Amino acid sequence: MLEGGVDHVIRRGWYESTDFWSPSLYRELFFGFLKDEIDTCHRANVTYDYCMNSGAMPLLEIFNELKFDIFSNFDPLLSNTDLVKIKKTVGRELALCGGVNNFLVLEKGTEEEVEAAVKDAVNKLAGGGGYILAPGDSIYLSTDETTRRNFYKMIAVWKEIRNGSI
C-alpha cells in the first residue's frame, strides 16, 4: 500500500475502544500491531490518523506511547468524552481532529447549539495549536436543509473565533 504513493493512512479504531476492551486487553491485543503499523507509516513519511468516536478516554496514555499523528473523530457527547482531558493528555503529542457532535448537533440541532458546540470545542482544544475543528463522525449534507445550514454555521462560527476572539 505505501509503495503506491499514499500520503496519509486513516485507521478506524471504533471496535478497538474500551467500549469493547479493557485498557489491559487493548494493550495485549492491539498495541503491538498498531505500533508496527504506525512505525511503518512513519518510516515511509506517511502520516497516521487514528479514529475513535467513543471509549478512548482510558486509552489516552497508551495513545501517547503509540505515537500516531492525529487522533480524530472523538465526539464530546459520547461515553464521557472529556475534551479538556484529551487536550491535556495527548494534545501536546498528537494533532486533534473532532470535537463537535455530528448527529444531535450538526444534523438535528439549532444554529445556537452549533455555535455553542463550536465555541466549546475551540475553547477546550485549540489552545497551543494542533487542532482541526471537525464533527465526531460523518455528516450527510444531502439529508435535509438543517444539516447543510448547520455545517455552514459551524464554519462561520469558526471563522469568527479562529484568531482567539471567543
Task: Identify the residue ranges that each predicted region occupies.
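Active-site loop segments of alpha/beta catalytic cores
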Residues: 1-166
